């Protein structure tokens, strides 16, 4: 009887690297030619080939060269193989497409896209020559230059992949959304976003009294015209327009942010006391401020301490930008995974919705525990107000969970950078 591994060996493809002539089974360490030729090459061999090619091009005299003269070439190779290199990119390609449409009208090979990304890297570096990889070799058989896929090195991490996909999505969606919505009618868009966020957290009866209006559906009608927006009471407009700014600065401890939050919450408190007689909004504001205070001075400080230790351990593997030697240039939480304006804006817009979903899960868990252990307790508020409390708790829980995920993603990113560094060093030095 034929053993099963005999059929498996027939399925597995055997390859010969045309550089080192080594034969083995095709796996993730190989690169297949995309030019149509039946050729394969090791990732390490391809990187070593590129390294030697650029050393001969930029460093022809290797006798009197200073130490680390090839560091720019090695840095470019690290960026080339980094499967998550967009973590360190400080601009959105969508912004470029909107100003230079030709980038969106043709398929750009990885070499051109890579050079385009590297140009932004070296515009801010002062300690290395501003050159990038200019040659990527050619197929020995058909002589095509665009003959191979981009070699990448990554680690298996679902959390890191989640953050990478989230950053890529926001990089395209937010700039396009701002162009199509904010630039066409920024006032209406800001009003709609603020009202939608308030509806995610507060029930209808609370919003009716807080915003001094018979029904919030009327606000949708008012928002259709400029005259309708002007007819909305000033206090209500401030609450709606300022809500997203309040969320953006809720954990900010700067003087301007504290002043803005104090003024905004004073307006909300005054409106709540004047028009709403249900559950006390001042108590909700007080507890929210206490929770924010505890978050800033306990959890956030603990997270920053962990980030500092992570930077001290893995900061040497960071190859991008000019901030690796200055820890004050960027926040500690952005040292390994940069957050751009579009990612921050998307987080603040979706935060109330995520908090509402999280609060719903917490409420269901609370009711299940109450039924499971037969706890006799009735809250002194309406069901919609009780749900509002859990929505606010859900926002805090979502913020803590998101910060924890970012910390873990930074930890995995540090491991990935270490793996990339070892791969390039071993490939270039021939180890």
Curated annotation (Swiss-Prot):
Keyword vocabulary terms for this entry: Membrane, Transmembrane, Transmembrane helix
Subcellular location: Membrane
Topology class, membrane: Multi-pass membrane protein
Membrane-spanning intervals of the chain: 228-248, 279-299, 349-369, 388-408
Domain of life the protein comes from: Eukaryota
A GO cellular component annotation in the UniProt record: membrane
Name of protein: Uncharacterized protein YMR187C
Organism: Saccharomyces cerevisiae (strain ATCC 204508 / S288c)
